[in-house]
Amino acid sequence: MLCVSGFTSNLYSSKKDDKMKEISRTSNWGSSFSEKSGCMQTHPSMNLDCRDVTYVMNLLLIAHHHLLQ
């Protein structure tokens, strides 16, 4: 059973890597990152604006902080 789950996670991570390569190919993350606003312009298909990204990042930070305690 362990073998199967290992294979599944490998399959998933390789698919994820392909998706990341595809995203980095289709959008220039470097130029779309705005240091002035501290905000990343996300891929149009994600339908996220700066506030959404900041909100999600804050939630992740809060969750991480609680996990450490």
Curated annotation (Swiss-Prot):
Entry protein name: Putative uncharacterized protein encoded by LINC00474
